């Protein structure tokens, strides 16, 4: 589908058609739109946009998966027949992360990033509609009995790398990169991978200005050691997570330390793992070890990873062509010996020549060649200063460092945090053009204590509401009336179309680069002198403190709050 039409589902006009109406249309000065101010025509446009959101009743649905925060359905629009995926939030305390994820996905445009299609309303909550990916996730593919040659595996690794390279280029890193969050698409061209689930994504910290230390978030088996130790971390944490995914791809095993050997300091046990890789290309294994380096500074960037994988793919394809050329004369000779020129049919014809999926034990194998293609371990250069191999002479038992720490619960948890003010602001206050001011304290109640805290979820999605004492705890953080609190908690910025803007040097540094997808969708930058709608929250808080706030416009749907002047006066 054309990305410019992704918000046109279920009767939605394309975003380009709604742009002029949102920016003011015929009311006031069309060249200046201030943050926190909206003309009557703009307000009517917002009301119209909300009234035209699709309802869950507009779709037929089939559940295809579930996770810690949400359930995923394959849905078909009753009127248009369009097939999409619906991600329904199931955890009230994760609502802010879901809104942030929808905003971020709406700004991204890349073939290896899950495409955002629109929004669905159900029981007062917003849920994301995305493109439907037809072959599940990477973990499911690797756990299947399907034969995956090295060319396919390296191609999947390349797809994930270029998707993450694009994300990092935009100034954002994932923080929850796992094989579960890499979706697999299958078409006439074969397999391809798409990166999804950006609910924990964060702005890449700037070490030069001493950014706030980020919270511990993610899925423990894939989390970088520095994250697990609650140390400062950056986008190189994604590279370590990617390295664990490469281990899964190479050995076709789970990331669980019961299968994937780890060290006591949460690193990869290189020596033990290289006995599990079969005939893996040595340069592919070397890249995997580089990504899993305990020292973040020694890990490659995704741009470098992509270039390396391109070279590996090119070499593997050349070797495959050469092998086919050598097999052609042999096959031709066999056909000539068969009466009537019929092709020989044998068991060998049905078994792949080489299946790069050896296992420690035969019962884990998925084909005959898995059993008999084991090769002796090769020598790989390990440049990890923190690597502590197990002593094979003393038969040291396999290590599961995630069982040694009580807070990690054996790795069967997921850590999450409220969105920080440095990534994408979730507060959108529209001021009515009337007299009178309202203080910030009167309009907004705190979401959480000043210090940011990380939280963990139990391993079983079915156990969420019973085992999470903090579910719904945000509703009790304030003594205000529940209706008012719920409307103020999850106010969202930029439900209307996103636009580029002429940012100052400071705001340009804070804001995420999203010019390419917007230009692709037909948007143009604002005229000079206009204020951005999507600046960093820290900058917007300064603006709010410097100028008096007018009565907020109130319109509440799915936890999104806009408050009208008439309601305030009444």
Curated annotation (Swiss-Prot):
Residue(s) carrying Phosphoserine: 219, 369, 456, 460
Chief place where the protein resides: nucleus
Regulation: Activated by autophosphorylation on Ser-219.
Catalytic reaction equation(s): L-seryl-[protein] + ATP = O-phospho-L-seryl-[protein] + ADP + H(+); L-threonyl-[protein] + ATP = O-phospho-L-threonyl-[protein] + ADP + H(+); L-tyrosyl-[protein] + ATP = O-phospho-L-tyrosyl-[protein] + ADP + H(+)
Organism the protein comes from: Rattus norvegicus
Keyword tags: ATP-binding, Kinase, Magnesium, Manganese, Metal-binding, Nucleotide-binding, Nucleus, Phosphoprotein, Serine/threonine-protein kinase, Transferase, Tyrosine-protein kinase
Pfam families with a match to the protein in the record: PK_Tyr_Ser-Thr
Biological processes per GO annotation: actin cytoskeleton organization; apoptotic process; focal adhesion assembly; intracellular signal transduction; protein phosphorylation; spermatogenesis
Family stated for the protein in its record: Belongs to the protein kinase superfamily. TKL Ser/Thr protein kinase family.
Biased composition (Polar residues): 558-570
Active site: 176
Protein EC: 2.7.12.1
Domain of life (superkingdom): Eukaryota
Name recorded for this polypeptide: Dual specificity testis-specific protein kinase 2
Function field: Dual specificity protein kinase activity catalyzing autophosphorylation and phosphorylation of exogenous substrates on both serine/threonine and tyrosine residues. Phosphorylates cofilin at 'Ser-3'. May play an important role in spermatogenesis.
Required cofactor names: Mg(2+); Mn(2+)
Stretches for region Disordered: 513-570
Domain Protein kinase stretches: 58-313
GO molecular function: ATP binding; metal ion binding; protein serine kinase activity; protein serine/threonine kinase activity; protein serine/threonine/tyrosine kinase activity; protein tyrosine kinase activity
A GO CC term assigned to this protein in UniProt: cytoplasm
Gene symbol of the encoding locus: Tesk2
Tissues with expression: Predominantly expressed in testis and prostate. Found predominantly in non-germinal Sertoli cells.
Protein's cellular compartments: Nucleus
Positions annotated to bind ATP: 64-72, 87
């Amino acid at each position: 589908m054309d990305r410019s039409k992704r918000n046109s589902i279920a009767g939605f006009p394309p975003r380009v058609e709604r742009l002029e109406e949102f920016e003011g249309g015929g009311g006031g000065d069309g060249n200046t739109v201030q943050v926190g101010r909206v003309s009557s025509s703009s307000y009517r446009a917002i009301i119209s946009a909300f009234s035209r959101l699709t309802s869950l009743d507009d779709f037929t649905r089939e559940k295809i998966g579930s996770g810690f925060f949400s359930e995923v359905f394959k849905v078909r629009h009753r009127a248009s027949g369009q097939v999409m995926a619906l991600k329904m939030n199931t955890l009230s305390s994760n609502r802010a992360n879901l809104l942030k994820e929808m905003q971020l996905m709406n700004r991204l445009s890349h073939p290896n990033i899950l495409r955002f299609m629109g929004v669905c309303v159900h029981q007062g909550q917003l849920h994301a509609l995305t493109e439907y990916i037809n072959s599940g996730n990477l973990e499911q593919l690797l756990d299947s009995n399907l034969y995956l040659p090295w060319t396919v595996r390296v191609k999947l690794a390349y797809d994930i790398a270029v998707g993450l390279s694009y994300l990092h280029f935009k100034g954002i890193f994932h923080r929850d990169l796992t094989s579960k969050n890499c979706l697999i698409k299958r078409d006439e061209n074969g397999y391809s991978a798409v990166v999804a689930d950006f609910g924990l994504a964060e702005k890449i910290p700037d070490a030069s200005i001493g950014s706030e230390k980020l919270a511990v978030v993610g899925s423990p088996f894939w989390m970088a050691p520095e994250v697990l130790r609650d140390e400062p971390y950056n986008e190189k944490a994604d590279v370590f997570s990617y390295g664990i995914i490469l281990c899964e791809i190479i050995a076709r095993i789970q990331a669980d330390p019961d299968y994937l050997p780890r060290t006591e300091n949460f690193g990869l046990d290189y020596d033990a793992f290289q006995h599990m890789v079969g005939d893996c290309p040595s340069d592919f294994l070397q890249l995997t070890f580089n990504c899993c380096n305990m020292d973040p500074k020694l890990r490659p960037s995704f741009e470098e990873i992509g270039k390396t994988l391109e070279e590996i793919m090119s070499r593997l394809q050349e070797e495959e062509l050469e092998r086919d050329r050598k097999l052609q004369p042999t096959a031709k000779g066999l056909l000539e010996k068969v009466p009537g020129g019929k092709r020989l049919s044998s068991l060998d014809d049905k078994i792949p020549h080489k299946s790069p999926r050896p296992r420690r034990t035969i019962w884990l194998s998925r084909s005959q060649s898995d059993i008999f293609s084991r090769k002796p371990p090769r020598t790989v250069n390990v440049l990890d200063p923190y690597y502590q191999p197990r002593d094979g002479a003393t038969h040291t038992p396999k290590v599961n460092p995630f069982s040694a720490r009580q807070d990690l619960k054996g790795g069967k948890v997921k850590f999450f945090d409220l969105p920080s003010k440095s990534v994408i602001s979730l507060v959108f206050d529209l001021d009515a053009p009337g007299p009178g001011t309202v203080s910030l304290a009167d309009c907004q109640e705190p979401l959480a204590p000043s210090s940011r805290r990380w939280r963990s979820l139990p391993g079983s999605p079915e156990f969420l509401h019973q085992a999470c004492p903090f579910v719904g705890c945000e509703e009790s953080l304030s003594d205000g009336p529940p209706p008012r609190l719920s409307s103020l908690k999850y106010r969202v910025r930029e439900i209307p179309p996103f636009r580029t803007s002429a940012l100052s040097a400071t705001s340009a540094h804070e804001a995420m680069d999203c010019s390419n997808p917007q230009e692709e969708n037909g948007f143009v930058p604002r005229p000079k002198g206009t204020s951005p709608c999507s600046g960093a929250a820290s900058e917007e808080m300064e603006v709010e403190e410097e100028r008096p706030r007018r009565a907020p416009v109130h319109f509440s749907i799915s936890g999104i709050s806009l408050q009208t002047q008439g309601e305030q006066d009444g």
